[in-house]
Regions:
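Conserved ABC transporter NBD signature motif
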Residues: 42-54
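Conserved ABC ATPase "signature" region
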Residues: 106-125
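Short catalytic/signature loops enriched in Gly
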Residues: 121-127, 215-276
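Conserved ABC ATPase signature
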Residues: 129-134, 138
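A short, proline-enriched helix->beta-strand linker immediately N-terminal to the Walker B motif
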Residues: 149-153
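A short, surface-exposed alpha-helical micro-motif characterized by mixed small hydrophobic
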Residues: 197-199
Length: 277
């Protein structure tokens, strides 16, 4: 699936890992924390080293000290990662209890501080909420807060803005940039969105069919790509120019004087008393 991949991330650096779906980006990220089932997954060659220590050959106890602690990960869909049966407070407290041994009383203040830092409004009130009560952007902010509670040295973000609308994407990217500078942490950012890469990355690694075909500084790669696949990838980036419309194009859909109302029901018999308009 991935073959002869070599890359490195410096302290405080953002490396964007880009490529089409199935190129091996997420598999690479999951391998950093040994989150792929082994067997069947194996690592015939190479190694992954964190501060010089092998992660591929580390025992489970060593990995527990790294996973979610010194290296944290944000996944693409927070509803899959957050437990729908537990409140935000319970899930965030579990992180501090497991990785930092904090008691609930001491943890609450740190949880509130972290939620406010990532832009969750009315944080004390939201602690009792369940994941389904949050918007998509709020859930992703909670995932970022959960990752940052342990003050990681490296944050892996796997397509963290894919399911969000453009305005929320911009907020999340700004937040990640600010937090990276504040904490001086490394960031491995996985995406297929080249416009995001331009905004966020210091360096870019391009993957194709499980191989890294090109690595370079962000500005250098966008201005002078060397590998044919990288050039095709950049050429596929939308220009933003709309397709010209023929002046005599027939009308496909029209709405005229449309109103939409929902009934307001009250009382024991749930009778309609008014409408929301």
């Amino acid at each position: 699936v991935v073959s002869e991949l070599s890359l490195q991330i410096a302290v405080g650096e953002t490396l964007a890992l880009v490529g089409e779906s199935g190129s091996g980006k997420s598999v690479t990220a999951l391998s950093v924390l040994r989150l792929l089932p082994s067997p069947p997954v194996s690592y015939p060659t190479g190694d992954i080293r964190f501060h010089g220590q092998s992660l591929l050959h580390a025992d489970e106890r060593t990995l527990r000290g790294v996973r979610g602690n010194r290296i944290a990960m944000i996944f693409q869909e927070p509803m899959v990662s957050l437990n729908p049966l537990h409140t935000l407070e319970k899930q965030l407290y579990e992180v501090l209890s497991l990785h930092r041994g904090m008691r609930k009383e001491a943890a609450r203040g740190e949880i509130l501080d972290c939620l406010e830092r990532v832009g969750i409004r009315n944080a004390p009130r939201r602690l009792a909420d369940y994941p389904h009560q949050l918007s998509g952007g709020e859930r992703q902010r909670v995932m970022i807060a959960m990752a940052l509670l342990t003050r990681p040295e490296l944050l892996i973000a796997d397509e963290p803005t894919t399911a969000l609308d453009v305005s929320v994407q911009a907020q999340i990217l700004t937040l990640l940039r600010e937090l990276k500078q504040e904490l001086n942490m490394g960031l491995l950012f996985i995406t297929h969105n080249l416009s995001i890469v331009r905004q966020l990355a210091d360096r870019v690694a391009v993957m194709q069919n499980g191989r890294c075909v090109e690595q370079n500084g962000c500005q250098a790669l966008f201005s002078a790509p060397e590998h044919p696949y990288t050039r095709r990838l950049l050429d596929s980036e939308p220009s933003g120019d709309p397709v010209p419309l023929a002046p005599d194009a027939p009308v496909l859909l029209r709405a005229e004087n449309l109103s939409i109302a929902f009934p307001i029901r009250k009382g024991l018999l749930r009778r309609v008393v008014d409408h929301n308009r």
